[in-house]
Amino acid sequence: MKLPFIFLITLLIFVSSCTSILINESSDEQRIYSFSPTTSPFDPRSLNQELKIGRIGYCFDCARACMRRGKYIRTCSFERKLCRCSISGIK
């Protein structure tokens, strides 16, 4: 009689701990993916500034890569992640 009782208690503890872990994970997912633009902590102007800095940085890296090859920069598109160097070399 003692062995089935201990087994049952152990099983209940195991199931309850797994259930609490699953509930915590599901509530974390809800917190992560909920986004409301009206209560957003991001300032659109600072976000736009970060995008400009990213674009300048990407095109600067593109120009450096072209210079290492001894070529001029031809096109740089941050949106399409496109960097093209000229065909002719630097004279």
Curated annotation (Swiss-Prot):
Compartment(s) where it occurs, according to its Swiss-Prot or TrEMBL record: Secreted
Report the domain of life of the source organism. Answer: Eukaryota
Keyword annotations for this protein? Disulfide bond, Secreted, Signal
Q: Which residues form the signal peptide?
A: 1-20
Query: Is Signal tagged as a keyword?
Result: yes
> In the UniProt record, does the keyword Transmembrane occur?
no
Disulfide bridges in this chain? 59-76, 62-83, 66-85
**GO CC annotation:** extracellular region
Task: Quote the InterPro entries the UniProt record gives.
Answer: DEFL_AtLURE1-like (IPR047497)
> What tissue expression does the UniProt record report for this protein?
Expressed in the pistil. Detected in the synergid cells.
Family recorded in the similarity comment: Belongs to the DEFL family.
Q: What is the role of this chain?
A: Pollen tube attractants guiding pollen tubes to the ovular micropyle.
* The protein, known as: Protein LURE 1.6
Which species does the entry assign this protein to?
Arabidopsis thaliana
